[in-house]
Amino acid sequence: MSEINNPFVVKGRIPAACFCDRVAETEKLTRELLNGNDVVIMSSRRLGKTGLIQHCFDQPAISGHYYTFFVDILETSSLQEFVYKLSSQLFEILQPMGRKFVDFFVNSLKSLQAGWTYDPLSGMPKFTFSMGAFTKPEVTLGEIFAMLELADRRCIVAIDEFQQIAKYPEKNVEAVLRGFIQHLNNCDFIFAGSDRHLIAEMFSAYGRPFYTTTSTLN
């Protein structure tokens, strides 16, 4: 049986050769990131936010000069879960990059030092933490951002379904995140959301911590 090459990819990462249209959006998002701007993307679910972000990350101007991270926080419901998700996905991305990157991550997260386990054959650290290990989420979050600030390349972190943080029981999560992010010089952010009303309010309502801090892509 001959191999079937289906250009209509509906799941997983979309190869560059199969990514159609969205030329203007790709160019704008890439340009904003190259200029060091944070970006908010507002679009309903299943309309291609994730594919657009990953396609942007694949652009030579980005992939050859930045460390890129994508984190989906749709299923999180608290700051503790947010930090757990962010930590686990950063580790998952860094692990294939080699021991230097993994050790940098492990040594940076001092609040978790006692909980690391190691592969008996390779000696590589393994991320086997439970949610309960993140007893000081704000401290761990600060350590993560400090690590990104010290990276030897500029970093881009895309957080999908960012509006979830407004639903956490903790009342100051937006302010906490903004407090960390505003001091970073080596890291840019993409905030993507599918709840257009809520995500728009977070970035355009006077008095909200992220008010007028980003460029917008609809």
Regions found by a protein language model. Name each.
Residues 196-214:
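Short regulatory helix/loop adjacent to the ATP-binding pocket of P-loop NTPases
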Residues 39, 69-71, 190, 217:
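Hydrophobic/aromatic beta-strand patches that form the interior of the parallel beta-sheet core
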Residues 1-39, 44:
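A short, basic N-terminal segment
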Residues 31, 55-62, 179-182, 204:
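Short, well-ordered alpha-helices that flank and scaffold nucleotide-derived cofactor binding pockets
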Residues 43-47, 51-156:
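P-loop NTPase nucleotide-binding core
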Residues 127-195, 204-206:
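Conserved Walker B catalytic segment
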Residues 64-68, 185-187, 212-216:
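Short glycine-/polar-rich loops that comprise or flank the Walker A/P-loop
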Residues 36, 74-78, 164, 194-198:
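Conserved nucleotide-binding/hydrolysis micro-motifs of P-loop NTPases
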